[in-house]
Amino acid sequence: MTYDEALEYIHGIYWRGSKLGLSRTREILELLGNPQKQLKFVHVAGTNGKGSTCAMLEAIFRKAGYNTGLYISPYIIKFNERMQYNGEPISDTDLAEITEYVSTFAETMQDKPTEFELVTAIGMEFFKRKKCDIVILETGLGGEMDSTNIIDVPEAAVITAIDIDHIRELGGTIESVASAKAGIIKAGGDVVYYGNNPIAANVFATKCAAVGAKLSIVDFESLNVKECTINGAIFDYTVNDSLYENVHIPLPGTYQSRNCALVLTTIELLKKKFDISKEAVIEGIASVKWPGRFEVLCRKPIFIADGGHNPHGIQGTADSIRHHFQNKKVMVIMGVMADKDVSPMLDILTPLVKSAYTVKPNNPRAMDPELLAEKFRERGIAATAYNDIERGVACAFNDARPDDVICALGSFYMYNDIADAVKKLTCELS
């Protein structure tokens, strides 16, 4: 099987649909000899901030000298990013070889796996072969019925910020979303929650009490942000009498220091089981890279790409715009999935927007850009719709002055097209 054949095989699974339950994942992993049982995990669920949190945790473990695995979704640029070893995506050769190996077992199953279940099995086999010391494992959707939830008790279960998202699958209340995420909490385990919502916190506390798990909630009162610029933040944070001073996180966005506080709270728990020095923590955070999170793609005009795609995520983007650009109104390029309730997101954005360029992300679930443009117009914002992302970006650049700010947001699925379009425009890259 070649690399292209492997991708064709993986993506060809989609027609089998999205089906609830862990039975298929368990079956294929059993056929593979249960590679996950030879690994240790930090399991990460939540609505927003999962990717950045996973990236920071992986970087810290790697700086501490551990061989790391990282499992994430969705990928941003290339599929191989879904599973990484020591900070590098799986090679084309390894992906082809392991996919062919796993496919021989998948084809024997009467109830065939979904795409995500197949990829999870490929990832587990990859991490086993690489003999990872620790795998940072991000859920795909929810928690309880997510195919990553076939692992035993993880070294820590980490739950990032909770908000209403994926209403069809997770329900339309904070309690229903939190209940799904709480599925990664296992008997006797350590659990760390970001702590942004008291309703969610109560759900997690109840689940922890029921199964004998220990819950820690991030203390943002102990977070002192000294500096926050478009180039990142510097802050102090105290957790369990450990003071982390002058921590530099190179990821822009005012929300990243809070994500980092979640990571530091988790690391303090993990120090009981792993040899992680304060130097490794500081160096790991300082080295982290994560595209599409309030990322500056261009300086004149300033062009920012952000993956915010639900009210909490958009609020984080809006807060960052206010912090970095004060009273300046921005030009927005936005594309979303059709199943999103965009009204709360637009209500947050509208006071900051002077013009909107709506586009269609490269995904069959994408919302018609004209429908999104009309929703902007209903709020008094001039908006133009484009089916082609490159044309939308080009028109925004054409309308922008050198001191303007353009922000592309609404879906991670359009990041690659946005970045490519910006590169094609000969703007002054930083």
Label every model-predicted segment.
Residues Y194-G195, K207-T229, I249-T254, V281-S287, ...:
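Beta-strand->loop->alpha-helix junctions that form or flank phosphate-binding loops
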Residues L22, R26-K37, K63-D152, L170, ...:
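ATP-dependent carboxylate-amine ligase catalytic core
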Residues N197-K207, V211-S216, N231, I302-A305, ...:
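C-terminal helical cap/extension that packs against the catalytic core
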Residues Q110, L118, K131-E138, P154-E155, ...:
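Acidic, Mg2+-coordinating active-site environments of NTP-dependent enzymes
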Residues D111, K131-D133, N327, R401-D404:
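Short, high-confidence coil segments that cap the C-terminus of an alpha-helix
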Residues F412-S430:
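Glycine/aspartate-rich loop-and-adjacent alpha/beta segment that forms the canonical ThDP
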Residues K37-Q38, I134-L137, M145-V158, I162-H166, ...:
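Nucleotide phosphate-binding/pyrophosphate-handling subdomain across enzymes
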Residues M1-G46, T53, A59-Y66, Y71, ...:
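Short functional linear segments
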